[in-house]
């Protein structure tokens, strides 16, 4: 998917020195790139028995919601603590300096739901691992995690696949951080 990769802008030293930030807003602005991205996911997941798509706040919403629409299934927003109005279930996870918490509405998943988990990219895998654990608490089966970008040097895909047995599909990879 070199077309999709070519539409992703790299911002050096953001948000801190030494980081190469992979910015998907340039991809979202491009009608061809956006259509190709969503179309790639639709083609991969159509007819797989997925019952819901879950997206991790905030960039996972950008592919997850249109994909859910195209697949004819519901969308589950996974949000930071305190952002959902109804009863929630939460999962804490480690950050580089501290901890964070993500939540999902308790009634958004039925036992046996076959969930596709979406985000814009996978780096170290910390947030994605927490999201998988959160969804499994409610009885969901995770079909796969789908991302636009994999940063394989940071090991997130490997962790998700080895520790939680969740396959990861990415449209493109970038080396480095």
Curated annotation (Swiss-Prot):
Q: Which CDD domains does UniProt cross-reference here?
A: PRTases_typeI (cd06223)
Q: In which pathway does it act?
A: Purine metabolism; AMP biosynthesis via salvage pathway; AMP from adenine: step 1/1
Q: Which InterPro entries match?
A: Ade_phspho_trans, Adenine_PRTase, PRibTrfase_dom, PRTase-like
The EC number(s) given in the record are: 2.4.2.7
What Pfam families does the record point to?
Pribosyltran
Offer an example of a GO molecular function term for this protein. Answer: AMP binding
Listed under GO cellular component are:
cytoplasm
This protein's major location comes to: cytoplasm
- Keywords assigned: Cytoplasm, Glycosyltransferase, Purine salvage, Transferase
As for what it does, the entry says: Catalyzes a salvage reaction resulting in the formation of AMP, that is energically less costly than de novo synthesis.
PANTHER family in the record: ADENINE PHOSPHORIBOSYLTRANSFERASE, PHOSPHORIBOSYLTRANSFERASE DOMAIN-CONTAINING PROTEIN
Under which name does UniProt file this protein?
Adenine phosphoribosyltransferase
- From which organism does this entry originate? Leptospira interrogans serogroup Icterohaemorrhagiae serovar Lai (strain 56601)
